[in-house]
Each structure stands twice: as structure tokens, then as C-alpha cells.
Amino acid sequence: MFLIALSLPLYAVHSVNQPLNMWDLVATVVCLCGIVIAYFADTQLYEFVSRNNKLKGLGKPVVSVLDSGLWYYCRHPNYFGEQLWWWGLVVFAWSLGLGWTFIGALVNTMCLAYVTRLVEDRMLKQESRAEAFRVYQKTTSVWVPWFKSSPSGVKNKNA
């Protein structure tokens, strides 16, 4: 039922016969960016997990935190890409006067916010990763890709 409700914006957009406008172009760009970001983030995560599984199988230490590629700029770029997709669909529907479609994207955003918290709590419970992940949390944006910040309490090496 939840997935059907989330898909209602697609139905709404395709049920109206209107010519394309500027907002459709904006929505298309947002949706495509979301798909590309989610794809590359998920691919990078898969490669990270696979590499760590190989290292673990060889008895070597694993890398505690994925902080390269898109993961350098935010802690959950895959979720960011997914959010771009859903909010892009809202832009499509909104331009057709179907503003109610934002409800699905909003519910999805709230669910991912909750899942984000669960994932991060799980990372902090793993002793081998907790310290590195705390630094990663302090220096890296949660969802929206942004520049790194310096962790508080860590002195600059050049000072």
C-alpha cells in the first residue's frame, strides 16, 4: 500500500494531457540528477562493502568508513539522490496543479530521515568503526552534498 501511495504522483502526472513547460524541464533535470547520484552512490557503497568482505576473508583489517567519491561530500548520497527523484516528481505534478502530490515525497523524506538515524546508530555501536564514524559525522553533511568541515576539538596540523 505504501509503495502504491508513493507512486500516485506518477499516475497524476501521466493522467493529464498538458504541453510541456519550463517546470517540466526543471523536474526532468532534478529527477535525472537524482537517478545518477543514487546509482553512483549505491555502486560506490557496493564496491566498498565487497572490498571490505574480501579484506575480512583474507584476515586483513577493513576500512571503517566509506569517505571517498560521493561519500566524501555527504554521509548518505544515495538517500539524497532518491530524494531528488521524488521531489522532482512533485515538481512535475505541482506544475499541473496537483500540489497534493508533495505528501508522498514528504512521507518518503520522513521515512528516510528515520532510517538515516537507525543506520548511523548502528555504525556507532560497532566498536571498530565508532571513533572514525564520529569524526565522519562531525565533518560531513548528512544528506546534502557539501564541503567538509574540520571536526571540533581537532587542532590544525599546520597551526
Stretch-by-stretch model annotation:
Residues 1-5:
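Specific transmembrane helices
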Residues 6-44, 49, 53, 57-159:
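Hydrophobic transmembrane alpha-helices
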